[in-house]
């Protein structure tokens, strides 16, 4: 069974989990940091060029990284490719709106907000 590795948070893996649920793609949703983080440290050494989480590891052991790349790859695998340009636009619009939410109003806001010790906002 494919594995989705991410922290025990919604975060950047939420869209992947939602797609897998909707497309009936069975995954093992795993927290590699459970316990002493040894599993995560071992994986990072095995795949040093893969960056941070989330990771999607398919049945043959291939490691996919970058949440949006994982999401788009799984969407193609699940048959969520639009032939109609308008439907494709709506699909991309939903995708990008979700990204905007994550960046501006979602879970990442507290980490970058001056109110929570993040950098001061600048007017452009």
Where are these regions (language model features)?
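GST-like domain detector, emphasizing the conserved glutathione-binding G-site
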Residues: 1-123
């Amino acid at each position: 069974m494919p594995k989705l590795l991410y922290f025990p948070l919604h975060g950047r893996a939420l869209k992947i989990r939602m797609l897998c649920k909707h497309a009936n793609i069975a995954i093992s949703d795993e927290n590699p940091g459970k316990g002493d983080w040894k599993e995560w440290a071992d994986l990072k050494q095995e795949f040093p060029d893969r960056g941070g989480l989330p990771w999607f590891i398919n049945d043959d052991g291939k490691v996919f990284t970058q949440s949006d790349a994982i999401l788009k790859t799984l969407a193609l695998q699940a048959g969520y490719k639009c032939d109609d340009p308008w439907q494709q636009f709506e699909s991309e619009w939903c995708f990008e709106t979700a990204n905007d939410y994550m960046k501006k109003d979602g879970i990442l806001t507290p980490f970058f907000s001056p109110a929570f010790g993040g950098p001061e906002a600048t007017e452009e």
